[in-house]
Each structure stands twice: as structure tokens, then as C-alpha cells.
A protein has these predicted regions:
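Short intrinsically disordered coil segments
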Residues: 26-27, 79-82, 118, 134-140, ...
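Short beta-strands and strand-coil junctions in structured, solvent-facing domains, enriched
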Residues: 71-74, 92-93, 109, 127, ...
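An acidic/polar, Gly/Ser/Thr-rich interaction patch typically located in mid-to-C-terminal regions
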Residues: 49-77, 208-300
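Extended Gly/Ser/Thr-rich low-complexity repeat segments
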Residues: 74-85, 130-137, 255-259
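Assembly/oligomerization scaffold segments
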Residues: 1-120, 274, 282-284
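Short beta-strand segments
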Residues: 96-99, 133, 267-269
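Short beta-strand-centered interaction patches in the first periplasmic/extracellular domains
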Residues: 114-128, 158-232
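Amphipathic, non-transmembrane alpha-helical segments in extracytoplasmic/periplasmic proteins
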Residues: 62-67, 80, 121, 134-158, ...
Length: 300
């Protein structure tokens, strides 16, 4: 089935992160955001997006470059409180959100006949550092309940309790904490074996000892380019795998993937960190993935 040109769409507006995204991650129709579209056709703009994402508690970042924007559009990007969503996919409408965050810095400069505008963005993960509270729970309370309550105190994100699948409960002595939400979550992560982050405006939790049940296959047919072991130290201790592939929809931090290479054995595990490098005009359509030796990875 022909899916049309590869395509990137930027949605820019003062909306809250995730506001233009449905619960399943697909973009909502309509809205007042400014739309900038780039694909292989001659009548769209050139856009390049370099995006870094992780399951660990760090902000996801995006470096977006747009060629020859109008001055009014550049001025809009520089207004306080502007956010951006990056959608990637194909012109037939099969698009997914690969980044949602706030605009931190905008720079425009002339390069020959072109005006190059660079937009530097970051997710709302750093909002957690500003969120402080005092909280206490009686013994026997589920860890899931505590994490859900903490996440709901973070401004500007969506929390779905059904997607917080954390096992265990606190001891009979109870649990109390005074300080920032980030410190509280870090303490719970270390004790109960999970990781959490904000991914495109959604609060996401992954257990360290199990990967999600649905696995996406990366092979030569889907655009797999390279898979190589991460080696460390004098005795070449393997710490994980590095994977390079064409961009495949649905792969994001926390996703379970199966890698089938003609030159390496089959590898299964969860995505820990990844980068997207997307530019439809130059046919750059790649992702680089790091899988570490935990989170359900199969290295046997």
C-alpha cells in the first residue's frame, strides 16, 4: 500500500503539552495551533527535527530547524509560553506524535539565500523539580496509588492510572515524605524497581524487570541498518545493544522491540534511550536506539 511522501508536521501554539494528543498518542483534529508541514513535495517547507528521548527521569529535547519562515511566524515562536508538537509519518494521514514540549530558544540567521530558524525545545519534565509537597500514607497502601498521587501533582501533564502498573505495597510503618515530587519518585523508583518519565505530555511508568508484552519487530524489511553490542572494560563486558534503523512508527522509550539482523542473533528488550533524525526533504528518516542490560532485555 502506497503511503505517500514521508511527512513532518509542526503544531505551534500556547496549548498545554499533550493537549492536542488523544490518549492513544494520535493527534486530535482541529485546534488553533499554527501548522507547518514538510514532505517530499515541492510546495512544502523544509523542516529537520533531531529529537532525544529516554525512559529515565530527564527532559526529552528537540532541535528543530525550519528554512525560510515568515517574519511573523518567527515572532510568534518567540512569544512566551509557546509549545510545539512534532508529528511524523506519511502524507496520507498516518501520523504520530514523536515530541511535545515547550519552546526554550529561537534563533534565526541568514545562510546564503536562506533564512534558517532553529527552535530548541524541552519537555515538561523539569516542572517536577518545582513541584513540592508533604505527603504521608498508612501501611499497606499500594505503591501504584502513591505514584499516581505524586504524578497528579505535576503541572501540565496527563496521568492515566490504568497505565501505572507498579507492583507492591508499603510496609506496616507507612510512608511519608517532605520535599520535591522528583525526589519522592526517585526514592520510590530505587526501592520498588521502576522508572518513570514524561513522554509527550504523558506520565509513563515502566517496571525494570519486565518489558511491555507487545513487541515491535525491527529487521531489514522494516529498515534495520545496524545492530552492535555495547562493550565496556578490558574484558569487553556487554552492557547492551546499539541499534540504527529507519524510523518505524510506534517505537519510543519503554517500547518492547525484537531485533532480527542477518548478521547478529535475535535480540529482544526494551528501548531505554533513542534519537530521531527526520528530514523528508533530504530523505533523512532515521532513529538510533540504546537497549541496556536490564528492563527485560534478553542477552542469553
Amino acid at each position: 500500500m502506497y503511503e505517500g511522501y514521508r511527512q513532518i508536521e509542526l503544531l505551534i501554539g500556547p496549548f498545554v503539552e499533550g493537549e492536542l494528543t488523544n490518549p492513544d498518542g494520535t493527534p486530535k483534529k482541529g485546534g488553533s495551533a499554527l501548522s507547518i508541514i514538510s514532505n517530499g513535495s515541492v510546495n512544502t517547507m523544509r523542516v529537520q527535527a533531531s529529537i532525544s528521548k529516554s525512559i529515565f527521569w530527564v527532559s526529552n529535547t528537540a532541535n528543530i530547524i525550519v528554512w525560510n519562515l515568515k517574519k511573523d511566524t518567527i515572532n510568534r515562536l518567540r512569544r512566551p509560553g509557546q509549545n510545539v508538537q512534532v508529528l511524523a509519518g506519511y502524507e496520507n494521514g498516518n501520523m504520530e506524535v514523536v515530541f511535545s514540549g515547550g519552546i526554550g530558544y529561537v534563533k534565526s540567521e541568514r545562510q546564503g539565500p536562506d533564512i534558517i530558524t532553529t527552535i530548541m525545545c524541552k519537555t515538561g519534565g523539569m516542572d517536577m523539580l518545582k513541584s513540592s509537597m508533604s505527603i504521608s500514607y498508612t501501611g499497606g497502601t499500594s505503591v501504584k496509588q502513591i505514584v499516581t498521587d505524586l504524578a497528579q501533582q505535576i503541572p501540565g501533564i496527563t496521568v492515566d492510572p490504568e497505565k501505572i502498573n507498579i507492583k507492591g505495597q508499603i510496609g506496616y510503618a507507612g510512608w511519608s515524605f517532605v520535599g520535591s515530587v522528583s525526589d519522592a519518585l526517585e526514592k520510590l523508583q530505587f526501592q520498588y524497581g521502576f522508572t518513570c518519565n514524561i513522554d509527550d505530555g504523558m506520565f509513563v511508568v515502566n517496571m525494570d524487570d519486565e518489558a511491555p508484552s507487545l513487541s515491535i519487530v525491527l529487521d531489514e524489511k522494516s529498515g534495520l541498518k545496524r545492530v552492535s553490542p555495547q562493550l565496556y572494560g578490558l574484558f569487553f563486558f556487554q552492557t547492551g545493544w546499539d541499534i540504527e534503523s529507519e524510523y518505524v512508527q510506534g517505537v519510543r522509550p519503554g517500547t518492547s522491540i525484537t531485533v532480527r539482523s542477518l548478521y547478529e542473533r535475535e535480540v529482544k528488550g526494551g528501548v531505554h534511550t533513542m534519537t530521531y533524525n527526520l528530514c523528508p526533504k533530504t530523505n533523512q528518516w532515521d532513529m538510533n536506539i540504546s537497549m541496556l542490560n536490564f528492563f527485560g532485555s534478553d542477552y542469553s
